[in-house]
């Protein structure tokens, strides 16, 4: 369980690092599970490739639904104790993914707030980034802007359309999250974060289960909302009968064209790719409004 100082640090800075929350045995089991999912003989290929070579996998979708190792890790009691301390006693599993930066590849992830992709009635949403390799500047560790969650949701639009990247981030304020394997970064849904490409000879693989308070409900439209909700699972406490609503207005993630991932919408490849070649995520699409 987190102490008061750690909880306050998360509230103040929008993130919290707990080193080596998972031991080497748990980490190695997860790495072995990745190898199983990437086995060429595996008929299910729930992943996305790096565009540079078309062979290196940069993301595995919904690993908790694909392998028991990740389902168990996402429900680890020590991990959930931390989540409960940060967002309250009623905890829902939201979604999961595996982000992987291959050696000498590893796509850039531009500055963004996770909440921009899935606005909810309140902001008690947190992602646990579980590092399965040592994370360093050279292999593209995560970077965060401390306290940026206090700014609220910023625009992630380009030319009137959602592009999943925040404009005008002051990178001089950023902190590099360099941690050993088994460590966890708890990230507030409004904290600005990014990562560079991997310039090292070593991979950087990260498992990301996301959680939300039971009284936080999605407010965006499009089939993506319904798609995510089908995987929601109550992990602690009880389901909510009411939606807790923060005051304010949120810009909805309405894109120019359908896309399958953060990578595609940030790099703009969704504007060029055939829809059949993307596992589209169901985000709403509309014409830009007149200015």
Regions from the PLM with identified roles:
Residues 1-13, 18-111, 116-120:
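Non-heme Fe(II)-dependent double-stranded beta-helix
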Residues 36-40, 89, 135, 151, ...:
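Phosphate/oxyanion-binding loops and surfaces in catalytic or ligand/nucleic-acid-binding neighborhoods
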Residues 40, 44, 191-192, 196-291:
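Non-heme Fe(II)/2-oxoglutarate
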Residues 86, 119-137, 178-179, 186, ...:
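Short, conserved beta-strand element in jelly-roll/cupin
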Residues 97, 102, 113, 130-134, ...:
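Short, structured patches in soluble enzyme cores that scaffold and shape functional sites
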Residues 113, 159-173, 201-203, 221-230:
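Short, surface-exposed loop/helix-turn segments at secondary-structure junctions
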Residues 114-116, 125, 189, 194-198:
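Glycine-rich phosphate/pyrophosphate-binding beta-alpha loops
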Residues 135-196, 216:
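Double-stranded beta-helix
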């Amino acid at each position: 369980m987190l102490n008061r100082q750690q909880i306050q640090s998360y509230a103040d800075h929008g993130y919290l690092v707990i080193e080596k929350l998972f031991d080497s045995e748990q980490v190695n089991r997860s790495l072995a599970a990745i190898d199983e999912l990437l086995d060429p003989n595996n008929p299910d290929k729930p992943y996305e490739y790096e565009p540079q070579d078309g062979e290196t996998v940069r993301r595995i979708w919904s690993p908790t639904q694909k392998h028991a190792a990740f389902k168990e890790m996402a429900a680890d009691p020590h991990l959930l104790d931390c989540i409960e301390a940060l967002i309250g006693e009623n905890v829902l599993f939201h979604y999961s993914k595996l982000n992987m930066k291959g050696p000498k590849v590893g796509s850039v992830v531009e500055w963004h707030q996770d909440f921009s992709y899935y606005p909810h009635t309140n902001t008690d949403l947190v992602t646990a980034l579980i590092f399965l390799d040592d994370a360093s500047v050279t292999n593209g560790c995560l970077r965060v802007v401390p306290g940026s969650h206090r700014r609220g949701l910023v625009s992630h639009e380009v030319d009137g359309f959602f592009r999943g990247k925040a404009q005008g981030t002051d990178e001089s304020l950023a902190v590099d999250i360099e941690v050993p394997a088994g460590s966890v970064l708890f990230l507030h849904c409004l904290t600005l974060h990014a990562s560079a490409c991997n310039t090292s000879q070593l991979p950087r693989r990260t498992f990301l289960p996301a959680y939300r308070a039971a009284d936080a409900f999605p407010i965006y439209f499009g089939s993506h909302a319904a798609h995510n909700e089908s995987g929601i699972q109550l992990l602690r406490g009880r389901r909510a009968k009411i939606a807790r609503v923060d005051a304010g207005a949120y810009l909805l993630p309405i894109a120019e064209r359908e896309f399958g991932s953060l990578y595609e919408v940030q790099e703009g490849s969704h504007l060029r790719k055939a829809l059949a070649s993307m596992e589209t995520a169901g985000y709403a699409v509309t014409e830009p409004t007149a200015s």
